[in-house]
Amino acid sequence: MVKDILAPGLRVVFCGINPGLSSANTGFPFAHPANRFWKVIHLAGFTDRQLKPEEAEKLLDFRCGVTKLVDRPTVQATEVKLHGLRSGGRNLIEKIEDYQPAALAVLGKQAFEQGFSQRGIAWGKQKIAIGATMVWVLPNPSGLNRIKTEKLVEAYRELDQALIMRGL
């Protein structure tokens, strides 16, 4: 089981789609060696060094958190069913209402659209908010995603810069 890493007062909560098998086996988020999450958040400015999956709790030191839309692990996120994403979206809203981070970053456009019943969204900051929490959609850092690491870093850095501009 991969547990959430959440606390009040966070700058951002990164929301993955669901745990992969590596994460399910280790209990750490974004644990597959091909997953670029830890590298990308470091290069984008969220952490001062590249953390390892087993150091996930240290995200709190950087006022960052991690959660997921769906608890059930799969080999690929495409195996997650629509009803699981919709239910996960409702649960995620409750978590965000409880913790109220400055931003929620959902990592995947299709997962966001399905989990939040949205259509035709663009990358970046969304029009919707959850209370005072800005909602962003960023590309998923999975190694299965073909987007280049530089583009991932650019997208994540845009969020980091938006938070800095708000004094966070």
From Swiss-Prot:
GO MF annotation list: DNA binding; pyrimidine-specific mismatch base pair DNA N-glycosylase activity; uracil DNA N-glycosylase activity
Organism: Salmonella choleraesuis (strain SC-B67)
Compartments where found: Cytoplasm
Coiled coil: none
Pfam family, one: UDG
Function recorded in the entry: Excises ethenocytosine and uracil, which can arise by alkylation or deamination of cytosine, respectively, from the corresponding mispairs with guanine in ds-DNA. It is capable of hydrolyzing the carbon-nitrogen bond between the sugar-phosphate backbone of the DNA and the mispaired base. The complementary strand guanine functions in substrate recognition. Required for DNA damage lesion repair in stationary-phase cells.
Swiss-Prot/TrEMBL keywords: Cytoplasm, DNA damage, DNA excision, DNA repair, DNA-binding, Hydrolase
Domain of life from the UniProt record: Bacteria
Broad EC category: hydrolase
Name used for this protein in its record: G/U mismatch-specific DNA glycosylase
GO CC terms in record: cytoplasm
GO biological process: base-excision repair, AP site formation
Chief location: cytoplasm
Quaternary context: Binds DNA as a monomer.
Catalytic activity, as annotated: Specifically hydrolyzes mismatched double-stranded DNA and polynucleotides, releasing free uracil
EC number of this enzyme: 3.2.2.28
Family label: Belongs to the uracil-DNA glycosylase (UDG) superfamily. TDG/mug family.
HAMAP family according to UniProt: MUG
